[in-house]
């Protein structure tokens, strides 16, 4: 494992020229005695400003925060937008958001369709439905940026997690967009000139602390002042930004242990051809040690519906911000 200074220097030196992958530190998946294993990535906006001093300030701050919160970097890989696009990593990462953007008109149930029309107060006969990508395909003049601009002319309505809608009328055409923001969201990562930096994190710090105080709220203006997002928000110019908002919140960290399990496989497995079934993530090793069969352990990645403490939800949501051991107990109690 290389020093923090050496790793930061490698990122700064190589990130601008990495079109595919740069494996700076091989990810030590599952190889830890610490209690939590997470996936973190640094988003393209950190590296897009072309200001080496600002990029260095960002790296210095982020790695200092990791040290402050006892979060060990156990793997580091630079990934170019072309690689993310080729392997469809971001499509899988965004899950339901992506599926609805690409196929809403085909996959929505009659019940969901009616809920959309009721929520928006419009008639089905007057307003056909389009996912964001579907609208682009049928309206070739709409780039991701132009569609994003249209989407944000009105406040969207939330049907449920990952499912946002709004009705529009443009040049005499009426229509409903579903997740119309997503093509631009996706393009931000898959644009060939953009890069992210994947970090495998091992830590004994509580998951909730890492999410709330290390990373900070999704909306940087609400983030803890000590957090990475809070620090970016408080002094954007130091890091090369005019301002910092949810649109450029700079970092991602797995929301919970089972989501982290999925993300490790999606990114490290998908991009680096790592067989995560043989190079098992920490949570898989611990599930098997707790008496869960390997088959049952891997079924958890499908995000089944489970019940715990009187709540019935999908496994990822029910274990957000929880440490690995209690999350395993929740899953095991449902088997």
Regions found by a protein language model. Name each.
Residues 1-335:
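Non-catalytic terminal and connector segments of soluble metabolic enzymes
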């Amino acid at each position: 494992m290389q020093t923090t200074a050496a790793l930061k220097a490698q990122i700064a030196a190589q990130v601008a020229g990495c079109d595919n992958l740069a494996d700076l530190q091989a990810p030590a998946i599952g190889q830890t005695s610490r209690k939590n294993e997470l996936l973190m990535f640094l988003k393209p906006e950190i590296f897009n400003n072309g200001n080496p001093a600002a990029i260095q300030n960002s790296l210095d701050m982020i790695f200092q925060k990791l040290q402050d919160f006892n979060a060990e970097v156990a793997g580091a890989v630079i990934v170019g937008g072309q690689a993310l696009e080729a392997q469809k990593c971001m499509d899988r990462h965004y899950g339901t958001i992506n599926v609805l953007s690409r196929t809403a008109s085909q996959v929505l149930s009659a019940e969901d369709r009616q809920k959309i029309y009721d929520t928006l107060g419009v008639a089905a006969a007057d307003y056909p439905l389009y996912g964001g990508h579907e609208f682009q395909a049928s309206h070739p003049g709409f780039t991701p940026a132009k569609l994003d601009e249209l989407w944000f002319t009105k406040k969207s309505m939330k049907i449920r997690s990952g499912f946002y809608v709004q009705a529009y009328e443009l040049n005499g055409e009426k229509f409903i967009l579903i997740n119309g923001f997503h093509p631009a969201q996706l393009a931000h990562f898959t644009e060939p000139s953009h890069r992210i930096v994947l970090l495998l994190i091992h830590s004994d710090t509580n998951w909730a602390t890492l999410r709330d105080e290390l990373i900070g709220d999704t909306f940087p203006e609400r983030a803890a002042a000590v957090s990475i997002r809070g620090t970016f928000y408080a002094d954007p110019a130091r890091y090369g930004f005019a301002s910092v908002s949810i649109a450029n919140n700079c970092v991602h960290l797995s929301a919970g242990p089972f989501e982290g399990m999925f993300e490790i496989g999606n990114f490290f497995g998908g991009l680096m051809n790592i067989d995560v079934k043989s190079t098992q993530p920490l949570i898989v090793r611990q599930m098997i040690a707790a008496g869960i069969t390997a088959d049952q352990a891997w079924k958890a990645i499908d995000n089944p519906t489970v019940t715990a403490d009187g709540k019935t939800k999908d496994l990822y949501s029910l274990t957000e911000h929880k440490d690995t051991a209690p999350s395993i107990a929740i899953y095991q109690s449902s088997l």
